[in-house]
A protein has these predicted regions:
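Bacterial N-terminal signal peptides
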Residues: 2-13
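Predominantly soluble domains enriched in secretory-pathway, periplasmic, or organellar proteins
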Residues: 17-335
Length: 335
């Protein structure tokens, strides 16, 4: 009897630990009349605004986080994917999959200021604060879209929004991350089943790291302090941890399926993985080579993109409209 009581108390303790660690759902933000798949997000820290790509709706949704309401819809886009709000210029960049354009909007009036035309499939966007450059991944082979073989690239826009140069990769680049203290950029190239490493300044490819443990590498996050790169794979669904000094895979752990966004929370040594299978995973970094899944939060199916805002300790996840399931943004507090 004492054994069973002890076991029950231990089980209860584990359940409580999972409920009180990781993430806490704070609120739902409704997005009425938004149909189809959702894609990536960006944030205006000072203005407390969230921007969400509604790919299937061909719109960008503007959300006031103080009121918890959508305040504007930007129509007429062409499957918007990546977004970036540049606080230094008060401009919003929106990358479009269908026509390859990146459209630049005034962050106050949302007037279209400029359009940068890439060859095809403008996707993820990143920012390099040192050079004040906006980087757009685009083009190339992409098996999921049935597109032909060809090179992809990272297009680098200067502070005025003009294309200044490109870094060519072997196929379509999915998620990519830049070092803040170094000069390397890491890019997932799933149609080649590898991570390609480039010198951001010289524009040359330095290395190609095969993702042999798992394939179809899409989201990525970087722990620069510990020289660790986190890769979200879909076939099978696993998180790969790569040593950025050697290119060696040092850890592999099971994660939610159909992931399209993952984030590293440096303050809590934690990784959040958003998957369309219908869960958000929280994994604790025990040390640079060891990771434990501490929580597995249920979400509406198809919720696979989001944004972690370290300044606020918040994670946002984008829910698509499917049947009776309405489009919305889930807001979580990291604990």
């Amino acid at each position: 009897m004492e054994y069973w009581i002890a076991a029950l108390l231990l089980l209860n303790g584990l359940v409580v630990a999972q409920e009180t660690s990781g993430l806490s759902l704070r609120t739902h933000i409704a997005l009425p009349n938004v149909d189809g798949r959702m894609d990536h997000l960006s944030v205006d820290i000072k203005g407390q605004r969230l921007f969400s790509s509604a790919l299937g709706n061909n719109t960008v949704e503007v959300i006031d986080l103080q009121s918890g309401k959508r305040v504007r819809t930007l129509p007429g886009l062409a499957e918007p994917q990546g977004l970036f709000f540049d606080a230094s210029t008060n401009r919003l960049y929106a990358a479009n999959g269908v026509d390859g354009s990146t459209r630049i909007f005034d962050g106050a009036t949302f007037q279209l200021l400029d359009t940068v035309k890439f060859s095809d499939d403008a996707d993820n966007i990143r920012y390099d604060a040192r050079s004040r450059s906006v980087i757009v991944g685009y083009g190339g082979e992409k098996g999921l879209r049935g597109r032909p073989q060809g090179s992809g690239a990272l297009g680098i826009l200067d502070s005025s929004g003009k294309l200044s140069r490109e870094i060519v990769v072997d196929a379509h680049p999915e998620s990519f991350q830049l070092e803040k203290t170094g000069t390397r950029v890491f890019a997932n190239v799933p149609d080649k089943q590898e991570v390609q490493v480039a010198d951001f300044v010289k524009g040359t490819i330095l290395a190609r790291w095969p993702t042999t443990v798992a394939r179809t590498c899409f989201p990525m996050a970087l722990d620069e302090a510990h020289h660790r790169l986190f890769i979200g794979c879909r076939a099978p669904a696993r998180l790969l941890v790569i040593d950025t000094e050697s290119g060696r895979t040092v850890a592999s752990t099971e994660i939610v399926g159909d992931t399209d966004d993952l984030f590293y929370d440096a303050a809590r040594s934690r990784i959040y993985v958003i998957g369309g299978q219908g869960f958000i995973d929280a994994l604790q970094q025990k040390d640079p080579d060891h990771y434990e899944r501490i929580a597995h939060y249920a979400t509406p199916p198809g919720t696979r993109t989001g944004l972690f805002v370290p300044e606020w300790g918040k994670l946002f996840a984008a829910v698509p409209h499917r049947g009776e399931q309405r489009s919305e943004i889930l807001e979580y507090d990291a604990k």
